[in-house]
Design a protein with these regions (language model features):
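Substrate-binding N-lobe of the ribokinase-like
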Residues: 16, 25-91, 95-99, 106-111, ...
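A short acidic, helix-capping loop that chelates divalent metal ions and anchors anionic groups
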Residues: 26-27, 191-194, 297
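Conserved phosphate-binding/catalytic region of the ribokinase-like
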Residues: 2-15, 201-311
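Ribokinase/PfkB-type carbohydrate-kinase core domain
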Residues: 2-17, 69-72, 77-80, 96-239, ...
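Short, flexible helix/strand-to-coil boundary loops that buttress conserved ligand/catalytic motifs
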Residues: 30, 194-197, 254
Length: 311
């Protein structure tokens, strides 16, 4: 490709700062790097945005693995703090009756994100969007760091709720919704959040509308797995996307929600019409379900989407 076709795209890279956990799923035979913010950041990097993770790891081999992988992917590591006293986040994965059982370990390095360092990174990056979830809010140090992070960033806030039992509560959800512009949740999470705020509307759409109005959100997106997704916006407009055509066998659904969120962020930053962004997000999430794990190992996976979407 001629250089003059590449250079404008490089200059137009948009900064997205993602706050939260980087962790490793520890299987009996291997470890796999993940965490929702990290998976979203990987996708944004592959689609030629400039994601910066604000997270914290231990001074250990998993940190070395993470930094090597981020370097391989061309990702910025400036926001990855190092903790001498706590390990890199881990999720223990065990096989039980033919399925996986996940245990998210407590008191990990990402529970101790340093607010001052996060502040310096955020102010230097000047993001066009920020992303956060609930898991990294389970401890006071990271919760305070997130509060400072959100106060620093004057751009839109994307809250990907990702409730992980037992690491969430009504207080965390309320505080997060109050600081958000765009919120993504699945249909089960919608029921949980609606119950927190005594919303007894008869349909999911009316529950979503009540949440959107109560917290003055711009968009509330609800994913429904194989049945697609829908949203409601501040103008009370609703959009639905049909189930994506599954062209390959479903291998697992790990990371499908992260893939969906990443493409919605891309769409918002590139001013795609929301029905287009929803359809593309659903299409990409379905493709992720056709591979093992939450993100592809090879960049070639992204090329057909970049070509189709003119990225």
């Amino acid at each position: 490709m001629p250089l003059d076709n590449v250079q404008p795209k490089r200059l137009a890279k948009k900064n997205v700062v993602l706050f939260g956990e980087v962790l490793a799923d520890i299987f009996p035979d291997q470890s796999v790097l993940g965490g929702a913010p990290f998976n979203v950041a990987r996708h944004l990097q592959a689609f030629d945005l400039h994601p910066v993770m604000i997270s914290r790891t231990g001074h250990d081999l998993l940190r070395d693995d993470l930094l090597r992988e981020m370097d391989r992917l061309g990702m910025d590591t400036i926001g990855i703090q190092c903790d001498q006293n706590h390990p890199t986040g881990q999720v223990q994965v065990e096989m039980e009756n033919g399925s996986h059982r996940f245990t998210i370990l407590p008191d990990q390095a990402y529970d101790h994100i340093h607010a001052g360092i996060a502040h310096m990174i955020t102010m230097s990056i000047k993001p066009e969007m920020v992303y956060f979830g609930t898991l990294a809010q389970r401890s006071m140090p990271s919760r305070l760091a997130l509060d400072k992070f959100l106060s620093d960033s004057k751009c839109p806030h994307f809250f990907d709720i990702n409730l992980r039992h037992p690491w969430y509560n009504k207080h965390t959800v309320r505080r997060s919704l109050m600081r958000s512009d765009i919120v993504k949740m699945n249909e089960d999470e919608l029921e949980i959040v609606a119950s927190y705020f005594k919303i007894n509307a008869p349909t999911p759409l009316l529950k979503a509308k009540a949440l959107l109005d109560q917290f003055e959100l711009k968009y509330l997106l609800v994913t429904c797995g194989e049945h697609g997704a829908w949203l409601i916006n501040q103008k009370n407009e609703t959009y639905n996307t049909d189930p994506a055509t599954q062209t390959q066998t479903i291998v697992d659904t790990v990371g499908a929600g992260d893939a969906f969120a990443a493409v919605i962020i891309i769409g918002l930053l590139h001013d795609w019409a929301m029905p287009v962004a929803m359809q593309r997000a659903n299409q990409f999430a379905a493709a992720i379900c056709g591979i093992r794990g939450g993100a592809p190992q090879q960049h070639e996976f992204y090329i057909p989407f970049k070509q189709a979407w003119n990225l």
